[in-house]
Structures are given as structure tokens and as C-alpha cells.
Amino acid sequence: MIKELRDCIDAGTEYCPCKLAETGECLICSQLQGACFCDCLNWKGVCIYQELFNNGNKAKEGRKSYSCLIKDVTNFNDEVVMIKFEAPHKLALDLVKPGSYIFVSQNENKYFDVPISIMESDIETNIITILVEVRGIKTKSILNLKAEENIIIRGPYWNGVFGIKNINSQKGGKSLVLARGIGVAPMMPVIRKLLSQDNDVKVVIDKTPFTDDFSKELLLKYSVEACENELLDKGTLSDHCKVIIKEALKEGVNYIHIAGADIFTYEVIEYLDKLDRNDILLSCCNNFKMCCGEGICGACTARFSGHRVRRFCKEQADPRSIFEGRRFI
């Protein structure tokens, strides 16, 4: 069992206190959980209880919806769609950080909102790039979008990546980024952040199940060379990936970002445990289902030992902790 500080991605931001605080379900504030004493789980420099009181004991206004002009649409065999659209400057600034995502819809019907990670947010041009894998009824409607039309988005949201604290702590070190499939999209802001903090970044990409390399253009922009290799083989870590990780550790890498499905993250953690390298810091994609993004609907919740319910659209976590003690009934 590892010691973990509970953290809320929205604590101390313009969207705090939220509806959870208003209803006594705040992730951080003990008094807004029903206790009669002050014992914040992870203080962010702002008293959430005081903020709620100053706001008339009501939650602050939530995220807004925006109608944005589409600048470019690239369709990759009706499997993946890359969309570039122009957003308000404030929104572009808010979506630069790792883990940023938005809810996208072709129209104003909220039933068709789909959470999509930000691939790039250019604060010079206010152009935001997203990559959408076409899977079901929500994403199929996105195939109809064309340049010079409008797209409805809601945001900003920031909990698309677990282990943000570990990303921010990397300065002047060596990092390894492992990405598979659609995970190349949320990988890009992480790489941008690591490079801005003078890190030496090695990137390995597994295109499976696609044939196109969607990140090639942006990696060239950041002057990063990526090598391609098979990272997963029939649900387990491939021999190639094990060699890549072992060699990276010998070279002094002390941080790994895993951009892919939960099974990929789990396998990397298991392999590091076998190597007795629990000292390696990690970050990974947040693959929990998202619906409202505010911790209200319960789509993102998971149950853990000790009758704990965690809302992962808001709660930041260390990648190792999202599998430890998790219950499936």
C-alpha cells in the first residue's frame, strides 16, 4: 500500500467551489464533507469553505459551451478524424496544460457530448487540434463535420492525465514516453511540457490498431524523433517494450509517461515492480468514462477497498493507485 495525497484538479481554480462542495461531497475540504474541524486533505492555498461562504453557499458558475469555427478536418479512412478549430484566446490558454480535454458535439444536444483530449493548443493562433477515434453513435456524428462549419465544445477540463504532479516535477532530466493507438493525442501536451522544462525526451510509438502516424507533424514541430515499435503483444507487454524500458532505466530515465489503454499502463507498472523499480515516477492517460465532467453523474466513479468511491473526472491520482485496492463488484 502506498501513501497517497488525495487531490482535486479543480481545487483553487475559477471553478471551485463546485456542486460537490455545495452538496457536502467536496474531495478536499473536511468541513464540506460534514466534519466539524478543518483538515484539508491537500491544501491548495485557498480555503474552499470560505470561498463557498463568500459565494452565498452556492457553487461557482461551471464550464461554458462555445461555438467554434472549424479550420480544417482530416479524415483517416473513417477511423480517425483530426479537427482543427479556432477558440477564444482564454480557452486556448486554459487548454495548453497536460491532461486538458473538452466535450465535443456536432450540435447543442448534450446527449451527444463526447470527451476528447487536446492534442495541441496553439496560443499564438488560438487553433486547437483534437483527434477523434470513430467508435459509436456519438463519434460517428463527427464524421459529418466540415471546414468553415461550427463545432460545439464545452470546457476547459484538466483531468485527462493521471500523475500531473510527476510531470511538473521533471526538470532537466531524462524521460521516456510510450504511446499506443489514439494515446498519441494526449501524449503531445505532455511532451511539450517536458521539453519546456529542459528534459531529454525519448518517444516510442505503437500505431496499432491504425496504419497512420497522427503525431508525426507535431513531433517534427517540437524537433522530437520518435521510433516505432510493438509495445503490446496479445494483451501483455512485448519483448521489444521490455527491452526499451530496461535500456532507458540504464540510461538514467527516472520518469515514464504511458499513453494508451489501462491494460498497457497496468503491464508497465507490473514490469517495473518485477525490476524492483518503484522509484520510477509515472503518468498515464485517464481512461475512465466521462459524461458530465463535474463529478455529479457517477460515470467516472470507481469503488475501492474500504468502501471508498473515487470520482476520477476530478480526482488526481498516482497511476499506481488507480489499480491498487480497486473493486469490480
Task: Report the location of each language-model feature.
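Short, charged low-complexity linear segments at domain edges
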Residues: 1-24, 76, 257, 262-289, ...
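OB/S1-fold single-stranded nucleic-acid-binding modules
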Residues: 3-4, 8-62
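Short Fe-S-cluster ligation motifs
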Residues: 6, 53-74, 313-329
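Local cysteine-cluster metal-coordination motifs and their immediate loop/turn environment
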Residues: 17-41, 286-319
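Ferredoxin-reductase
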Residues: 55-152
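FNR/FR-type flavoprotein reductase catalytic core
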Residues: 137-291
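Short acidic, glycine/serine/threonine-rich loops at helix termini
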Residues: 216, 295-296, 324
